[in-house]
Amino acid sequence: MFDSTLNPLWQRYILAVQEEVKPALGCTEPISLALAASVAAAELEGPVERVEAWVSPNLMKNGLGVTVPGTGMVGLPIAAALGALGGNANAGLEVLKDATAQAIADAKALLAAGKVSVKIQEPCNEILFSRAKVWNGEKWACVTIVGGHTNIVHIETHDGVVFTQQACVAEGEQESPLSVLSRTTLAEILKFVNEVQFAAIRFILDSAKLNCALSQEGLSGNWGLHIGATLEKQCERGLLAKDLSSSIVIRTSAASDARMGGATLPAMSNSGSGNQGITATMPVVVVAEHFGADDERLARALMLLHLSAIYIHNQLPRLSALCAATTAAMGAAAGMAWLVDGRYETISMAISSMIGDVSGMICDGASNSCAMKVSTSASAAWKAVLMALDDTAVTGNEGIVAHDVEQSIANLCALASHSMQQTDRQIIEIMASKAR
């Protein structure tokens, strides 16, 4: 429940964060397909004997090389099988949180028997599309997700249509929080962060708790490329400084290591991505600890980073050729700059420098190597903050960076939304040729 005295715009900010910052177990593209399969299985009469699935090229790209939690296996087929046999249809992005050892074994057996197929949907005009059809004899159920990782638009069985999402907005219905956010500015977001009641945003502290637990798992286990653990060892060997900069990179990349390596711990996601949530959150948590920030100060920094990351990513396609760890790290830069300095000018300079630094990084699918990009983005964010604290930043005379941070963001997002579409097609073509 909201305080009725709360600024209506601020209420929409909070709703936007609650919609876009959610726990997610496993990489969200395979999880989206697992959710479709799980919901379909819940509609099916009898046990699942066969699974057929179709996904958009972008979802295929992000599902080819990532480990599905608890299975030790990579790819969309195991995600679809486990979703159908062991998923919790009501758990959203945590659909696999209750999967048992028996369900995992059954899913692997279904896969080994050749009863699971995942193909690219053709034609497909959607960036994010997943459809799962499960069978029991001649009986079947089919679920389609479009536009968002949990946005179910159609459910159908052999008996007929069960559910279809209405395309139109009902008369009098409130505008979505993301639509409101798209018309705001970073300055307005900062005003909200500085002035909102702590009680209204205390919930965001959970994002620090979840991602810190994932980071600790990444440092204690042998997950993915174990970048965080490796860099921590280099600190002990004297090859890397034991300082704040190293700690930011180590703890952030460790969380991504665990997530991409298949750890059965949820990440607090941002904009439908666990890695984006990790990249935005962990650098700020480390800096907050360094300065001894209390819960209220940390919560305000977390709201700033999450809203900034959502605000930027909302101007992009849900999935694209641009590595979104870079835009999430712009949120981290905002949060860290606020903790150290608090000035709008410092925050905007840090984001501008980020755009001038890592904006060309491509997304070549979800995999263990995502942790490399997460670590690079986190490092770049702290570098940009340090520059801004010295009143230095990439200026509007250089590259795609403009004199105004809002225009710089728009320039970056235009690049990803339009010019990089051909890049995305080339990446998908290369990855598809490897999978043949």
Curated annotation (Swiss-Prot):
GO terms for biological process: L-cysteine catabolic process to pyruvate. InterPro entries: Ser_deHydtase-like_asu, UPF0597. GO terms for molecular function: L-cysteine desulfhydrase activity. PANTHER family: UPF0597 PROTEIN YHAM. Belongs to the UPF0597 family. This is UPF0597 protein YhaM.
